[in-house]
């Protein structure tokens, strides 16, 4: 018995067995098989700006917001505007799997647990043994624009967005409006590693 992958190679199975009403297929050689997980690769640093050129500002005491900020102010607040973007190897093809973190004394990583955006005090994990995580977002290029969007791996169809709430522009997680929703589009300006 064999199973075909997308590349045309196959996996030969030597045995099948039922354990607790679950069918297990035992391959002859599982050296080429990958488990469903995210494995951390390397990182880059960037400033994230909204479609209105506002800079993402992370203050651990408050929800992340977008602010009008000249470069001199952004540089003065670099620990709160410099995002550390860790890239992850993904066992599925869904976009570039990333985490977003800031280091202002201690490392904090963006989470969308329960669809609420917050930076949790933690280092991005080396490995995540699942295909979904509140920490992983799929960074994708927006067709026809020089912009990026970030889809939650945990909540399919939900994206990071810049949304006005009260008197502030906040970073939120929302379902993307398919009619040209620009609130989910961001500009990334890569910075030199420090």
Curated annotation (Swiss-Prot):
Keyword Disulfide bond (UniProt): no
Alphabetical list of InterPro entries matching this protein: IL-18, IL-1_fam, IL1/FGF
Post-translational modification: The pro-IL-18 precursor is processed by CASP1 to yield its mature, active form. The pro-IL-18 precursor is however not processed by Casp4/Casp11 in rodents. The pro-IL-18 precursor features autoinhibitory interactions between the propeptide and the post-cleavage-site region, preventing recognition by the IL18R1 receptor. Processing by CASP1 induces conformational changes to generate critical receptor-binding sites. The mature form is then secreted and released in the extracellular milieu by passing through the gasdermin-D (GSDMD) pore. In contrast, cleavage by CASP3 inactivates IL18.
Keywords attached to this entry: Cytokine, Cytoplasm, Inflammatory response, Secreted
Cellular location(s): Cytoplasm, Cytosol; Secreted
Top-level lineage group: Eukaryota
GO terms, biological process: angiogenesis; cell population proliferation; cellular response to cAMP; cellular response to hydrogen peroxide; cellular response to lipopolysaccharide; cellular response to mechanical stimulus; cellular response to parathyroid hormone stimulus; cellular response to peptide hormone stimulus
Site (Cleavage): 36-37, 71-72
A Pfam family this chain is assigned to: IL1
UniProt GO molecular function: cytokine activity; interleukin-18 receptor binding; receptor ligand activity
Keyword Secreted: yes
GO cellular component: apical plasma membrane; cytosol; extracellular space
Propeptide positions: 1-36
Subunit-structure text: Forms a ternary complex with ligand-binding receptor subunit IL18R1 and signaling receptor subunit IL18RAP at the plasma membrane. Mature IL18 first binds to IL18R1 forming a low affinity binary complex, which then interacts with IL18RAP to form a high affinity ternary complex that signals inside the cell. Interacts with cargo receptor TMED10; the interaction mediates the translocation from the cytoplasm into the ERGIC (endoplasmic reticulum-Golgi intermediate compartment) and thereby secretion.
Family of this protein: Belongs to the IL-1 family.
Function: Pro-inflammatory cytokine primarily involved in epithelial barrier repair, polarized T-helper 1 (Th1) cell and natural killer (NK) cell immune responses. Upon binding to IL18R1 and IL18RAP, forms a signaling ternary complex which activates NF-kappa-B, triggering synthesis of inflammatory mediators. Synergizes with IL12/interleukin-12 to induce IFNG synthesis from T-helper 1 (Th1) cells and natural killer (NK) cells.
UniProt-recorded name of the protein: Interleukin-18
Species name: Rattus norvegicus
Lineage, highest ranks first: Eukaryota, Metazoa, Chordata, Craniata, Vertebrata
């Amino acid at each position: 018995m064999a199973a075909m992958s997308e590349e045309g190679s196959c996996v030969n199975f030597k045995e099948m067995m039922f354990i607790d009403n679950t069918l297990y297929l035992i391959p002859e050689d599982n050296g080429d098989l990958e488990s469903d997980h995210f494995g951390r690769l390397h990182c880059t640093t960037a400033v994230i700006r909204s479609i209105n050129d506002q800079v993402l500002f992370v203050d651990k005491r408050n929800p992340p917001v977008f602010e009008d900020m000249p470069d001199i102010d952004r540089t003065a607040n670099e620990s709160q505007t410099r995002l550390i973007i860790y890239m992850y190897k993904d066992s599925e093809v869904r976009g570039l799997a990333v985490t977003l973190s800031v280091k202002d004394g201690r490392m904090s990583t963006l989470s969308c647990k329960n669809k609420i955006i917050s930076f949790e005090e933690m280092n991005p994990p080396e490995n995540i043994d699942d295909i979904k995580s509140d920490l992983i977002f799929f960074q994708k290029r927006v067709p026809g624009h020089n912009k990026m969007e970030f889809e939650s791996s945990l909540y399919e169809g939900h994206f990071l967005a810049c949304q006005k709430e009260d008197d502030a522009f906040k970073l939120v997680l929302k379902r993307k409006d398919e009619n040209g929703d620009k609130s989910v589009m961001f500009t990334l300006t890569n910075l030199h590693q420090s």
